[in-house]
Amino acid sequence: MLEDISLTVNSDSGQPVPVRAWRLAGQGGGPRVHLQAGVHADEIAGMLVLHKLLPRLEQAHVDGRLRGTVTVVPQANPLGIAQFRNGHVLGRFHEATSRNFNRHFNESAALQRPATTFAAWQKALVDLAVDARIVLDLHTDSEALPYLYVNRCFWPDARDLAGALDASVAILWDNDDDGAFEGAMVSHWLREKQIEGRLAATVELRGQSDVSDALADRDAQSIYAFLCGRGVIAERGDPRAWSGEAVPMGHMETVFAPVSGVLVYERELGAQVAEGERIARIVARPGDPSSEHVLRAPQAGRLVTRCRDRLIAQGDVVVKLTGSKPSANWTGGVLDP
């Protein structure tokens, strides 16, 4: 049966708030799985995907086909959801500490008695997930193709996940000094020498506006098929061959806005661009033709993400694109602040 294992953490005002979570215990000794969405509380697509996936998992359990134990956390961040300001949810950063909700998980997990609501929430999520053999953390970018972040130690075994989700790109990383949730899983498993046969991945489900029944149904089916292929569900998964691109994180190019202004894209998502090709421009002072700043591809590659706002601040990420060689600008760590 579906077990409610919801957690309670304190909000920034000191009031208890729930982290809704459910667990289905399988009967066949299959892998333990943790699925969550909404660590960045303004990234909505994964919430709807898990909302649609949970009844399918429950039916598999009723039918006796669930072999593994699956934990589902469709909306993982009650702190971020509470940050509605002027009609928008400020879901990426914790207002009280200015910390990115998907950073510092390693630090928080190591604390015996977390002193802040932020750290206590992070530790609770890690404790809920760390015993799983498969951990999928669902996110979205601003505007994006579907893509994955995967530690290199899981590659190429994670090609089945990339194929199931029809991911355009798998970004392979080696070291996570910033403490993303996925990185906290990997760090713990490596420390305990439990990495064999496991998988943790950050799944980027396109852009923040890509929320619909059609997309959520497709993604829920993709994750279901992946779980079938991994032996979590006793059902044929119809694995898809993956035709995407695996790129080391250091080969990704991030183009930042050199000035503030009106952002105009000249190439679409998914476009293959040549080194030096125009990809966008920023009109710093509308009405002044001399204020246009042209942005060019630092190297040849494919446009994977772009900013959805068309009025951009200096220093914001404009686009990210794949590269075939190390980026001259990458110094380690994650691609976004």
Give residue spans per PLM region.
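Structured catalytic-domain cores with a bias toward divalent-metal coordination
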Residues: 1-337
